């Protein structure tokens, strides 16, 4: 798993780390039971404070996507599977929208309208 952040972004680093893990889960690259890289390793590779990565992992824990246990690290939970299925469904929706020559803005408007 490769976690990427943009130091120039206005989005806090911890939020970018959490979003990167979520994206891997949605893409199916993170499966239930998979271990996330250690917070220490991620912090070192990104050149950020360890507590920044721990905060990201805590956010993911609070969302139910990872389980954190002392000595085991952060492990993906079963909650990552529905996220991957949703991503697959969205890809299929986008493909159907393209076949209908629907613009991304029009599709987004339909989704927003339906979501209400």
Protein language model features and the residues they cover:
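Enrichment for repetitive, rod-forming helical segments
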Residues: 29, 42, 47, 62, ...
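N-terminal helix-turn-helix
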Residues: 35-66
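Short, structured secondary-structure boundary patches
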Residues: 48, 54-57, 72-75, 88-95, ...
């Amino acid at each position: 798993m490769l976690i990427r952040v943009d130091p120039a972004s206005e989005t806090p680093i911890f939020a970018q780390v959490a979003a990167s893990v979520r994206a891997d889960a949605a893409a199916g690259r993170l499966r239930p039971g998979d271990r996330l890289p250690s917070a220490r390793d991620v912090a070192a590779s990104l050149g950020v404070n360890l507590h920044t990565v721990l905060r990201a992992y805590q956010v993911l824990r609070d969302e139910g996507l990872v389980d954190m246990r002392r000595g085991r690290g952060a492990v993906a939970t079963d909650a990552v599977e529905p996220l991957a299925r949703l991503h697959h469904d969205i890809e299929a929706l986008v493909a159907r929208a393209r076949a209908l020559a629907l613009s991304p803005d029009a599709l987004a408007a339909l989704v927003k309208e339906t979501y209400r």
